[in-house]
Every structure is written in C-alpha cells, then in structure tokens.
C-alpha cells in the first residue's frame, strides 16, 4: 500500500513465522503488537547496510526482452515482459504487462462489501467469480478492511461514497457504460475532464492516485518510498494495460520507466503496492501469477511468496 498511516510499521523476518497472511482476513491492527515486539529483535540484531545505487538507465532497445514483446493469449488479450531500463536494488527488474481490448472483454468490479464481506486472494476471486484474470481494485481502508480508500461504486452498491481529495487522488476508473456515447472504459482525470457529466455515463467506478495524466504528464509525486506495484493504464488506442513490477521503485521512477517503454501509454493510475499487490490470469492455456513483496517501512524484503487476501478486485470476462 501507499499510505502514510503505514510508515510506523516495521518488517521483520520473525513475522513470517506467524503465518497471519494465510488467514481469511489479514487483521493488520492485531498484527501491530506482534510487529512491535519483532522489531525490538530486528533493531537489536540486524545491521542496516546502505542501499545499493540503481544502475543508470539504459535507453537502448536492450531493455526489451524481445523486439516484438507481445505474446497473444487470446483474441484481444496479450502479454509482454520488459527489462526495466532502471534497475531496482532488489529482484529481477522485470515489468509484466497485460493488454486487454475492451471491445472483446467486459470488466467486473468485485467487492467483499457486497459478497458477504469475505476477503479472498486473487486466485480465489478468479475461481469464485469465473474470471479470466483479476487485479487489485485499489488500496483498501485498513480500519474497516472493506472500503476503497477513494470513491467506489458498482451499479447500486456503494462501497465508499466519499471522494478522497488528497495525495493526488485525481483518477477515477469508469467502466460498465450505460450507452455508447462514451468509451467502454476510461480513466477519468478529475483535473481535465468533466466528472459531473461523465459520472452519469457509467455504472462502475473506483478512485485512486493519478500517476500519468490525460496529457501524458507525470504527476509530481515526491514520496521517496519504494514498492512492488500494480497499475491500471490506458494506451493511445483505448486498450487497457495492467502493469506489474515486483521489484520496488518510487512512484516517479516507475512513471518515467513506463513512458520510456513501447507501450503508447495515454494515462496511468495506481492500484496497489507492497505484498498485497496481486495479478492473476489463467485462460487459454496461459497462466500468469504475480504477487508483490517489498514496501518501504512495512515489508522491506523480497521474501513474500503468497497472495494476500483482498476485499476488492477488478476482473475480466469475455463479452
């Protein structure tokens, strides 16, 4: 997650033995006391080494894994992997992208708040809702463990009625359109688009942090923390891009990296970061299973190998 409220939470390898992230709902408030005790040992016995400096960007075509990186999964569904031109200090610095044609695939907003308040991992949501793929729907509130940090509505169900007006929460993903006068899915930029008019055109919305604006400009985000991340993007042709990195970067770093890749990016918004970061696809003989790990100030390790339970996901099905 990318939340100031988590800055006082510390990682420790001792926490891994608790196995709390296997529970149906990760009770982070209860985890705080365990982490506090663990950090006493962490601070006393672990030496902090200086973070290695990342390598300088490589602007040549060598940052691509292939000159034609896209692999077809099905009609209107493709995937690609890229070597980041800026190397992270942890992991393989690989970026996974799933490209989805919204003319062929419908998007579903799935919230625990309208599904018996049951949290599920991404693979569990995938199976339960008969999806082809799914991803985080945004950061969730750590207090109630259900509501999105920003506005979220799905048809008549309101997960969070409140607009978040801080921390660059200027992007609202809108889909399940009411008529064909608008695109089937879009990221509404509150800084340059008419929200009052567009909110009448769709059934499903989720609000989050803007990374790249409607004018292809990087938002000036000064946060110095680094995270594994999954993002929601749109390209110049109106395709959806699900973008994942397990290797951690700052928000600004990663935005710059994305604009350097051959993705034809139009807009990008943040979905989730750290160990909650989830991306899962299984269809037509192809499986992509990605989970995040590193998060500054909370989970400063690349050791996470399990999906964490989530209250809200976005999934796709064929039209």
Where in the sequence are the language-model features?
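N-terminal Lys/Arg-rich, disordered targeting/topogenic segments
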Residues: 2-23
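Polar/charged alpha-helical tracts
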Residues: 16, 124, 197-200
């Amino acid at each position: 997650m990318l939340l100031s409220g988590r800055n006082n939470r510390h990682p420790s390898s001792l926490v891994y033995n608790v196995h709390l992230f296997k529970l149906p709902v990760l009770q982070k408030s209860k985890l705080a006391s365990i982490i506090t005790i663990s950090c006493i040992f962490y601070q006393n016995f672990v030496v902090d080494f200086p973070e290695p400096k990342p390598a300088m960007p490589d602007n040549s075509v060598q940052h691509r894994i292939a000159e034609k990186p896209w692999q077809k999964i099905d009609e209107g569904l493709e995937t690609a992997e890229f070597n980041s031109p800026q190397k992270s200090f942890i992991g393989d610095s690989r970026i996974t992208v799933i490209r989805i044609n919204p003319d062929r695939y419908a998007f579903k907003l799935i919230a625990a708040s309208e599904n018996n308040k049951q949290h599920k991992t991404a693979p569990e949501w995938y199976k339960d809702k008969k999806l082809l793929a799914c991803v985080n729907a945004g950061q969730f509130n750590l207090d109630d463990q259900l509501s999105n940090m920003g506005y979220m509505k799905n048809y008549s169900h309101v997960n969070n009625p409140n607009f978040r007006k801080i921390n660059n929460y200027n992007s609202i993903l809108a889909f399940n359109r009411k008529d064909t006068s608008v695109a089937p899915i879009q990221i509404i930029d509150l800084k340059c688009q008419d929200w009052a008019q567009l909110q009448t055109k769709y059934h499903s919305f989720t609000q989050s942090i803007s990374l790249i604006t409607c004018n292809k400009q990087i938002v000036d985000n000064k946060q110095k923390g680094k995270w594994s991340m999954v993002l929601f993007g749109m390209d110049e042709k109106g395709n959806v891009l699900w973008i994942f990195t397990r290797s951690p970067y700052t928000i600004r770093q990663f935005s710059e990296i994305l604009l350097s890749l051959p993705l034809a990016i139009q807009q990008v918004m943040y979905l989730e970061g750290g160990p909650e970061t989830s991306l899962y696809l299984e269809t037509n003989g192809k499986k992509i299973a990605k989970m995040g790990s590193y998060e500054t100030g909370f989970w400063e390790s690349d050791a996470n190998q399990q999906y964490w339970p989530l209250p809200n996901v976005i999934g796709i099905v064929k039209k």
